Amino acid sequence: MKALILICLLFVTATGQQPDSVPQLSLPELDGRTLRSEELKDKIVVLDFWATWCENCVSEIPEFNKLEKEYSSRGVKVIGLAVQSGWASDIQKFVRQYNMRYTVLVGNDDTVSDFGVISFPNTYVIGPGWKLYKKYSGVSETKAADIRRDIETLLKAKP
């Protein structure tokens, strides 16, 4: 157990990131505009890493559309971060095909590495101040309900 704690401490020291920190973003949207994490500091963000070839990612799109519709007026931003999915034009076709109603950013391998993503989908719930609240890897039957609960908790705590 002591060895595990030491390894974790060394990892945090080596990466310079605390467990609740989230890497900064500066990535293009599909329309070419750049979205920066500084613009999101007062929002609650649901950031989903996905890929066009990931069937589990596709299965989550309807839930993210619902979250966007339900919470966007309350300061919540749903963002799909497309990685390993080809050119922006390929992603744009996919977005239209699957009727994605939330912001889509085009990421790259550096983004995947910065966030420590090793599988898809990978979803982060980020609170105000760009602080990590919770991270979900993969899919589960309760993921959408869990994210809703996270959002509600963060909304109640928001000044």
Task: Give, region by region, the residue ranges found by the protein language model.
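Thiol-/selenol-based redox modules, centered on thioredoxin-like
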Residues: V125-P159
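Thiol-based oxidoreductase modules, predominantly thioredoxin-like and allied folds used
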Residues: G75-A88, M100-D109
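Short pre-active-site segment immediately N-terminal to redox-active cysteine/selenocysteine motifs
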Residues: K43-V45, F49-W53, S119
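Short, internal strand/loop/helix patches
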Residues: Q92-G129
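Conserved redox-active cysteine motifs that mediate thiol-disulfide chemistry
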Residues: F49-K66
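N-terminal "domain-start" segment that seeds a small globular fold
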Residues: A14-E38
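Hydrophobic beta-strand anchors of alpha/beta hydrolase catalytic cores
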Residues: V46-L47, V78, T123
